[in-house]
Amino acid sequence: MDKRWSLQGLTALVTGGASGIGHAIVEELAGFGAKIHVCDISKTLLNQSLSEWEKKGFQVSGSVCDASNRLERETLMQTVTTIFDGKLNILVNNVGTIRTKPTIEYEAEDFSFLISTNLESAYHLSQLSHPLLKASGNGIITFISSAAGIVSFDAASIYGLTKGALNQLARNLACEWAKDGIRANAVAPNFITTALAKPFLEDAGFNEILSSRTPLGRAGEPREVASLVAFLCLPAASYITGQTICVDGGLTVNGFSYQP
């Protein structure tokens, strides 16, 4: 295989990788030959996934971690440093969650929870990963953002601002860390068929609106996000950095349409 299209011999850390988009990303990266460490807050889901990946012959290890907790993030990176001998090629900041409320109904705890989970975790893990990414000689950071960080989603103002911040962080790190051989990009999905999105997608009215606003007429699948993440990590994508790329079925480019 052309080395441009292989991750053989490369190492990766995927946060929140035991389910949903993260799970699909692990499978995609492992399929290209990467050796991966996964962290997840759920011990049960993590163990189930690790067993599944072992049967598939993937090189995946894992540890339980609440990525919103600073001390647990530091412990995670100590583990990754040991496992990968001080070098890391790929960091996928995938952990994220949502709470939907009108803006005037959000409370301080909601703000703190969403900021620490969606934004602070990715920022701090990027800081902690920097020496490992630099040491690898070829570092790639991918932030899992959202279309909500680009266009307005009702009742999700805090979620949207955390995702918009990730898009900007990707731009900043792409410029600041390029000299260290590190690329950074953000991937911004539409609603994807995961457990997190299930309550929304099971609502017939919501689905009708989503389909009408999305040119491709449907929610996305986790593997459709994972395929882009994997591409951005490949040597073939070596000149792509600082970008926010939407995987949204056309949602963010859909304008106004009227047909009398």
Curated annotation (Swiss-Prot):
Molecular-function GO terms, alphabetical: oxidoreductase activity
Active-site residue numbers: 159
EC number: 1.1.1.-
Binding site for substrate: 146
Keywords associated with the record: NADP, Oxidoreductase
InterPro entries: NAD(P)-bd_dom_sf, SDR_fam, TR
GO cellular component: peroxisome
Class in the EC hierarchy, top level: oxidoreductase
SUPFAM superfamilies reported in the protein's UniProt record: NAD(P)-binding Rossmann-fold domains (SSF51735)
Cited function: Reductase active only on small flexible lipophilic carbonyls. No activity with cyclic monoterpenes, tropinone, nitrogen-containing tropinone analogs, tropine or pseudotropine as substrate.
Family recorded in the similarity comment: Belongs to the short-chain dehydrogenases/reductases (SDR) family. SDR65C subfamily.
Protein name: Tropinone reductase homolog At2g29330
Species, as recorded: Arabidopsis thaliana
